[in-house]
């Protein structure tokens, strides 16, 4: 299976660079993965597509203001993108500079903070806050929201609210679980009043989610690693919903990856740790029955995941329809609602 099989042409003006004024006013493309039938709805119409007894599973990670700008003592400019906070004073980060910093090099962040390079760990750098306080304090005071590169603008204060789900509560992500951005408090309340259940997993989305696939053959791709937690309570609720004939509806590809990682044994079990699960066509889903998701980049691992879920041909046809109907794409864009395609329809693959 080739990466080029997941390519499509997107007019640049369809990339959403800012969110709509109202979260739930986005459009919703509904795809029947069995027939390929497409319906165009508003996101609020999702309320009529889920049933009492279904379980919506959200990723409650919270985006941290992970982008820092500073300079070396020699004057050279440095950009730091935090990948993971490892302690109160240390972080793993991507560093952009004219020369990669060596151990002991100091990076000045505004007037009050100094980062010291401790060591290199693969593509990442371990940095210590050696002056000014804790990592969380540094990020809160000096950090910028890590908007995806395709948004192509500087972040502003509104992004601190809008590039964040209303239910986020576990800080640690450097990218938002964007399918959840469409849910507002009113829609969540309406879901609850209808008898739709909700559960929360945590997967801290890493900067690797923005990295392009650099191989030609899908199976050769090495997936980045991200930390996740699926609790025993969530597992029990999943089992109960399925036993009663309800559906597990994942809100976003990160919720899919969390649930399916916890289901690698063939049934869902509590899980806490890193995952590098790579889902592409041929993967047999264990837990997830339906999926709310945004539109994804060409040739991306997320496009491969939704293709595994609903069939590549149906997905690409739906994307073409969305382009013709002028849907808004990517993080601040519109959404899709997919039903899982039956397994065995495409060549196998999952790592």
Curated annotation (Swiss-Prot):
Keywords: Cytoplasm, Queuosine biosynthesis, S-adenosyl-L-methionine, Transferase. One of its GO terms (cellular component) is cytoplasm. Pathway: tRNA modification; tRNA-queuosine biosynthesis. One of its GO terms (biological process) is tRNA wobble guanine modification. Its EC number is 2.4.99.17. Pfam families: Queuosine_synth. It is found in: Cytoplasm. Monomer. Transfers and isomerizes the ribose moiety from AdoMet to the 7-aminomethyl group of 7-deazaguanine (preQ1-tRNA) to give epoxyqueuosine (oQ-tRNA). This is S-adenosylmethionine:tRNA ribosyltransferase-isomerase. The gene is queA.
């Amino acid at each position: 299976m080739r990466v080029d099989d997941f390519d499509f042409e997107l007019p640049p003006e369809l990339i959403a660079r800012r969110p709509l004024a109202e979260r739930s006013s986005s459009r919703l493309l509904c795809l029947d993965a069995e027939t390929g039938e497409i319906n165009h709805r508003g996101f609020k119409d999702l309320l009529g597509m889920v049933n009492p007894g279904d379980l919506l599973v959200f990723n409650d990670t919270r985006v941290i203001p992970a982008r820092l700008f500073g300079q070396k003592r020699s004057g050279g400019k440095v950009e730091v993108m935090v990948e993971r906070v490892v302690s109160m004073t240390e972080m793993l980060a991507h560093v952009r500079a004219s020369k990669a910093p060596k151990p002991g090099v100091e990076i000045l962040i505004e007037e009050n903070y100094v980062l010291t390079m401790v060591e290199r760990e693969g593509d990442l750098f371990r940095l210590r806050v050696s002056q000014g306080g804790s990592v969380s304090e540094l990020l809160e005071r000096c950090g910028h929201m890590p908007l995806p590169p395709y948004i192509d603008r500087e972040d502003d204060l509104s992004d601190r609210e809008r590039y964040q789900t209303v239910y986020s509560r576990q800080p640690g992500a450097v990218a938002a679980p964007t399918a959840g951005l469409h849910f507002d408090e009113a829609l969540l309340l309406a879901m609850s009043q209808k008898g739709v259940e909700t559960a929360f997993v945590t997967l801290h989305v890493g900067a690797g989610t923005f990295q392009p696939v650099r191989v030609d053959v899908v199976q050769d791709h090495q997936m980045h690693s991200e930390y996740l937690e699926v609790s025993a309570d969530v597992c029990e609720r999943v089992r109960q919903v399925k036993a009663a004939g309800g559906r597990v509806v994942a809100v976003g590809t990160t919720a899919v990856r969390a649930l399916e990682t916890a289901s690698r044994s063939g049934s869902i079990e509590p899980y806490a740790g890193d995952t590098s699960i790579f889902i592409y066509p041929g993967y047999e889903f264990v837990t997830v029955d339906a999926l709310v998701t945004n539109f994804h980049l060409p040739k991306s691992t997320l496009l491969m995941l939704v293709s595994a879920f609903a069939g590549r041909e149906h997905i690409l046809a739906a994307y073409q329809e969305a382009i013709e109907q002028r849907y808004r794409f990517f993080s601040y864009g519109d959404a899709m609602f997919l039903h899982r395609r039956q397994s065995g329809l495409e060549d196998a693959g999952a790592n």
